[in-house]
Amino acid sequence: FQPIKESIVSRLFNAVAAEDLIVKGGREIVPGMIVTGMEVAEIDGAPR
């Protein structure tokens, strides 16, 4: 049995830490398309 590793989604339930994780999560998801802010939450499936 392997424990489930903590993911960004599980850490986002902490609203205090969530904003920093979302801000740091900005990235290029396909060539020429950069996501930032709450779009990162959408891409990662975050519960926000």
Curated annotation (Swiss-Prot):
One of its GO terms (molecular function) is metal ion binding. It is found in: Plastid, Chloroplast. It comes from the Eukaryota. The keyword Phosphoprotein does not apply. Substrate binds at residues 18, 40. GO terms for biological process: thiamine biosynthetic process. Involved in biosynthesis of the thiamine precursor thiazole. Catalyzes the conversion of NAD and glycine to adenosine diphosphate 5-(2-hydroxyethyl)-4-methylthiazole-2-carboxylic acid (ADT), an adenylated thiazole intermediate. The reaction includes an iron-dependent sulfide transfer from a conserved cysteine residue of the protein to a thiazole intermediate. The enzyme can only undergo a single turnover, which suggests it is a suicide enzyme. May have additional roles in adaptation to various stress conditions and in DNA damage tolerance. Homooctamer. Belongs to the THI4 family. This is Thiamine thiazole synthase, chloroplastic. The lineage of its organism: Eukaryota, Viridiplantae, Streptophyta, Embryophyta, Tracheophyta.
